[in-house]
Amino acid sequence: MQWTALEPTKELQAILGFNKAQNWDDFDLALRDFMAPAQNFVFADKSGTIAYRANGHVPIRKIGDGKLPVPGDSSDYGWEGYVPFDELPTVINPEEGYIATANNEIVGEEYPYYITDFWAQPYRYERIAQLLESKEKLSVQDMKDIQMDTVNLYAAEFLPHFIETFKAADTADEYSQIIASLEAWNYDETIDSGQSLVFNFMMEEIKETLFKDAMPEDVY
């Protein structure tokens, strides 16, 4: 079993460097010592510089992408080092004026190295960006509110299509109250939201309907 975190690393030294950093160059230098596990790092200093780096050791594989086990008795499937530090995904002072990250996909097809296919769905990132762009200047309270925000853009994308289907179904009259309630929903998943309960139940049922009978029981 080969894993970057099983190799000698210097994360504690990196963290000490973060705490002593006076600017992005200092922080960037300390990042060189943070090797595993790979992390999304965001940076800001009092001069106004903001930056982001997807940092850590990312293997360059001779064959394959690491999704499935490979023969361990052949060097053909080994690693050819790591993605060079200076080629890790990095953003410094973007035009948007902010940086947001939520484990979303950070590189496109043009990026020359394989990182992973297991990105989070984009909805959390999109909601963060939506809130950051909602005001020209954000207060500390605004930032606290962003941390506690529960609006579900996943529901906002899919639910309107479901509602159209419900209305066209033979059972539309029977479930008219539920349909009307879902139509009125603002997609905020508060603790007492009945619409949120219905939506998430539907998503679980869709998963069951699509995949349960099509996949072996031991891998579902």
Predicted regions: what is each one?
Residues D45-Y220:
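Long, compositionally biased non-active-site segments enriched in small/hydrophobic residues and glycine
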Residues M1-Y77:
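Glycine- and hydrophobic-rich flexible loops that cap the catalytic core of alpha/beta enzyme folds
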